[in-house]
Regions:
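Flexible loop and strand-edge segments within Gram-negative outer membrane beta-barrel domains
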Residues: 127-130, 134-135, 139-147, 162-213, ...
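Transmembrane beta-strand segments of Gram-negative outer membrane beta-barrel proteins
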Residues: 52-72, 78-98, 115-124, 212-219, ...
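Outer-membrane beta-barrel translocator/receptor signature
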Residues: 73-74, 83-92, 96-135, 140-148, ...
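N-terminal periplasmic/intermembrane-space "pro-region" immediately following the signal or transit peptide
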Residues: 16-82
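Short sequence motifs at beta-strands and strand-loop junctions characteristic
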Residues: 86, 96-100, 132, 138-144, ...
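Short loop/turn motifs that connect adjacent beta-strands in outer-membrane beta-barrel proteins
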Residues: 80-87, 112-115, 155-162, 206-214, ...
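Exposed, low-structure sequence patches enriched in small/polar residues
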Residues: 92, 294, 302, 307-577
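Surface-exposed extracellular loop regions of Gram-negative outer-membrane beta-barrel proteins
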Residues: 110-132, 256-268, 273-311, 446-456
Length: 577
């Protein structure tokens, strides 16, 4: 009799899981192996009722361990700049000083990272002390700048709609004027007062991520007012401006392209009636970021058209300009030696508003028939040494300036005792070509992150295609030190420039306006303006400040015949709340 015994084993799955940001499931499987029992060698005798327990051999061979990780999708934590660093909505800077001066800056802002921003602001700067002019007379010398404005932006996905509106008021007094005898009715010490209202709107991108197409469309409008005090100046100048601009840019790998086009219309009213200027601008750029050289090249095209009322027909002039543009930076494998080449330029209209920004003492209602055109070229070396503690830039430059402005002054120098000697403090621009060769050096040294030393030196050689003095220095430079601490910050800087000269035209001796007779030129001496600033952070929101200017009390001039204040200072408070 044969006995057959079967044994069956089943291995049940065993699971384990672990949860540390992820779910882990581990499965092990075993496959049993069962073999047949060996038969006994002899026939057993069962009469003694003995029980036989046959031996059964079996083995278990586990399969290789298999582990499966099944991560669950987890939304990463995100934080925006505005959630991480929320600026306080209000900023105030207020101060006053001696001789009497004042400063005020106030900003109120609100920012929502998903909606947009809005900001309103007020700026004021004024000085009120009388200054003795070069004739030994103290006229009213009040000078003041005021601005009020608002700006806002609305986000539309990756694009933004922005707007800006503001009004400027710039007030000066002709304290450099003088008259021998009775100067009544000549406007001696009168006020030059300019108002400027502007509104602008743009829609588009910020041109930072060029992996997608970036674009911009912008519109601008403005109105300029002349409220100056002049005898018999009832129909005061007014000027309007309209402008439009469009730009598109895209990057492809290491390359990038951009195209820009713009249009400006400037029109005169009242005493400027019949004067207008149109400026069309187009610019093309191509850039490439290579390993050895990184460059941007292109060109700017301008069409400039001026029109003035005349008899028997209007006077019209049109000019076309092409200005090259280049930025080449070479990488020689070391941060301490980086050659570069730059070429650029600009076309600057010489309408009345632009001239008042260049020189506030310009003769009233002046509008020149050509724009100033600059072509600039620079070649040099730059780099960083000693783990970026020492930065330098050394270069030579050449500038060709067509229709450059040479500022002249007029003075009556009659020997007739019945005729008063008069200088009304008016500056008149005359255009001529100028070529400038310059040699420049700029150094910045940071031994530690909180301390900075800087030195700039610039030398100029002028080739003027006129006998008029250009009013520019042959040397200019500055040297300074600044410290930025956690509680205290301060800086000391000396601004220097060489002797400057302007042409003085003798109206009494001039008989032909095309050939003016020049008298002794006006000379501004070598100037050093020593400035000091100090900030003390009383708390995280309040800072006390002090600023000093012209502390060596030099005779300084920004405009000919108009000396600046001597040593002066301003103290006040800055607050965020």
């Amino acid at each position: 009799r044969m006995l057959f015994v079967a044994a069956l084993m089943a291995a049940l799955p065993w699971g384990a899981s672990a949860q540390v940001e992820k779910r882990v499931e581990v499965t092990k499987a075993y496959v049993p192996k069962v073999e047949s029992a060996s038969k006994l060698a002899v026939q057993p005798d069962m009469t003694d009722t003995a029980r036989m327990r046959p031996e059964i051999d079996y083995t278990i061979t586990p399969l290789s361990l298999r582990t499966t990780l099944s991560p669950r999708p987890i939304r990463p934590a995100t934080v925006t700049y505005w959630e991480f660093n929320r600026p306080l909505p209000f900023y105030l800077k207020a101060g006053a000083g001696y001789p009497l001066n004042s400063v005020l800056d106030f900003y109120a802002s609100s920012q929502n990272p998903s909606t947009g921003y809005v900001v309103g602001y007020v700026n004021h700067e004024g000085r009120y002390a009388d200054i003795k002019n070069d004739f030994g007379v103290k006229n009213n010398s009040t000078r003041m700048f005021n601005r009020i404005g608002a700006a806002a932006g609305k986000y539309f996905g990756r694009h933004i709609l922005e707007g800006d509106i503001y009004y400027d008021n710039r007030m000066y007094h002709r304290y450099g004027a003088w008259a021998d005898g009775d100067g009544a009715g000549l406007g001696i010490g009168g006020m030059n007062d300019y108002g400027d209202a502007n509104v602008a709107v743009r829609f588009g991108d910020n041109f930072q991520d060029l992996s997608r197409t970036n674009f911009e469309i912008a519109l601008r409008g403005g109105m300029f007012f002349d409220h100056s005090e002049w005898p018999d100046y009832g129909d005061k100048a007014r000027q309007t401006a309209l402008g439009a601009r469009a730009k598109i840019a895209r990057g492809f790998g290491r390359s990038r392209f951009s195209l820009e086009a713009g249009y400006e219309l400037r029109s005169g009213q009242k005493s400027l009636e019949g004067s207008s200027q149109q400026l069309i601008h187009a610019a093309l750029r191509y850039g490439f970021a290579g390993g050895v050289v990184r460059f941007d090249v292109g060109a700017d095209y301008y069409r400039d058209r001026t029109e003035f009322e005349g008899e028997p027909s209007n006077l019209v002039k049109s000019e076309n300009y092409v200005i090259p543009f280049a930025r080449l930076d070479f990488n020689l494998g070391t941060p301490g030696l980086k050659p570069f080449f730059e070429a650029d330029g600009a076309v600057t209209p010489n309408d009345f508003r632009a001239l008042t920004l260049e020189n506030p003492y310009v003769a009233s209602s002046t509008w020149l028939d050509k724009s100033s055109v600059d072509y600039n070229f620079r070649l040099g070396l730059g780099g960083s040494l000693w783990r970026s503690r020492f930065d330098y830039r050394v270069y030579a430059g050449v500038s060709v300036r067509d229709n450059h402005l040479f500022w002249t002054t007029y003075r009556s120098l009659s020997d007739d005792p019945a005729f008063s000697e008069v200088f009304q403090g008016v500056l008149v621009p005359v255009m001529a070509r100028q070529t400038v060769t310059s040699f420049n050096g700029e150094i910045e040294f940071r031994p530690v992150s909180a301390l900075k030393f800087d030195l700039d030196v610039h030398g100029y050689l002028y080739n003027d295609e006129t006998d008029l003095k250009n009013g520019a220095p042959s040397f200019a430079g500055n040297v300074g030190v600044a410290y930025e601490g956690r509680k205290v910050s301060f800086g000391v800087k000396a601004l220097m420039q060489g002797v400057r000269r302007w042409t003085v035209i003798d109206l009494s001796a001039t008989t032909d306006a095309s050939e003016p007779v020049c008298g002794p030129s006006f000379e501004a001496p070598f100037g050093v303006d020593l400035r000091v600033n100090f900030d003390w952070k009383v708390s995280g929101r309040v800072t006390l400040f002090a600023e000093g200017r012209n502390l060596v009390n030099r005779r300084l001039y920004e405009y000919p015949w108009y000396p600046e204040l001597g040593a002066n200072f301003t103290v006040g408070v800055k607050a965020n709340f």
